[in-house]
Amino acid sequence: MNSYKGVIFDFNGTLFFDNPKHVLAWGKISEEIRHHGISEEELHEHFNGVPNNKIIEYLFEGQCTDEQKQKYSLLKEQYYREFCKEDKETFHLVAGATEFFDKLKNNNIPFTIASASIKPNIDFFVESFHLDHWINPDDIVYDDGTYENKIMMFKKAAHILGLEVSDCLIIEDSLSGIENAYKAGCRNIIVIDSANKREECPPVHESCVSAPCGYGFFLLSHA
């Protein structure tokens, strides 16, 4: 643990594997707007990694108001939370996450979360997974509408930890998250390969490391 002074976690797809719940929620929204679900092709081209308001614009074929975007964005997240709670078998942090939190605490290494989730979802995660046992909820960086991109979110999270991004280890799962972590100045990035897209990662030096959390990951380190 001597190669970094702090840790910044992404959340969705990193500490909590929840992608199927997002797909179900968007499918329900699509049914309400278009009266049919979403195809696999649409999912990859118009949904994955796309902000809620852009997805809703797509579902309305560009003909929607700001009020409709707000309404359906909040409704989608409500459906998402309901689907999470209904599936008790998968509604938990990834195996070993809390042990890793404890290990960081015991080594006096500060850590927090930088997530693109909105505040109601963050509150939902804190309450459901008792994240406040390890992290001050006020220190969690989330999408409050003020961040231009996740680069700024990573920088804010590092600032909260009292560190430079270059002194942090960032744990991510998405290709855009990996790229933004690098652009923010991080050179130690752990990738949780929950989407099985390891071969699509940027061309960097890759070092396999033993997982402290009991789930598969690999380390991307940039010279």
Model-derived features: positions:
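Short amphipathic alpha-helical segments and helix-helix/interface helices
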Residues: 98-102, 178
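Substrate-recognition "cap/lid" segment bordering the active-site pocket of phosphatases
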Residues: 90, 112, 118-169, 175, ...
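Short acidic-hydrophobic, aromatic-tinged amphipathic segments that line or gate anion-handling sites
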Residues: 141, 207-219
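Helix N-cap/beta->alpha junction signal
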Residues: 19, 95, 115-118, 174
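Conserved Rossmann-like nucleotide-cofactor binding loop
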Residues: 14, 21, 119-120, 176, ...
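N-terminal helical cap/lid subdomain that shapes the substrate entry/recognition surface
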Residues: 2-95, 107
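Acidic, Mg2+-coordinating phosphoryl-transfer loop and its flanking beta/alpha structural elements
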Residues: 170-208
